[in-house]
Curated annotation (Swiss-Prot):
The lineage of its organism: Eukaryota, Metazoa, Ecdysozoa, Arthropoda, Hexapoda. Belongs to the MCD family. Bombolitin subfamily. Pfam families: Bombolitin. The keyword Cytoplasm does not apply. This is Bombolitin-3. GO terms for molecular function: toxin activity. The modification Valine amide is found at V17. Mast cell degranulating peptide. Its mast cell degranulation activity may be related to the activation of G-protein coupled receptors in mast cells as well as interaction with other proteins located in cell endosomal membranes in the mast cells. It comes from Bombus pensylvanicus (American bumblebee). Expressed by the venom gland. Its main location: secreted. Keywords: Amidation, G-protein coupled receptor impairing toxin, Mast cell degranulation, Secreted, Toxin.
Length: 17
């Protein structure tokens, strides 16, 4: 797992909210 992957997931979650 790379930092970019985590940021991408967080970005999607935040965008969903």
């Amino acid at each position: 797992i790379k930092i970019m992957d985590i940021l991408a997931k967080l970005g999607k979650v935040l965008a969903h909210v």
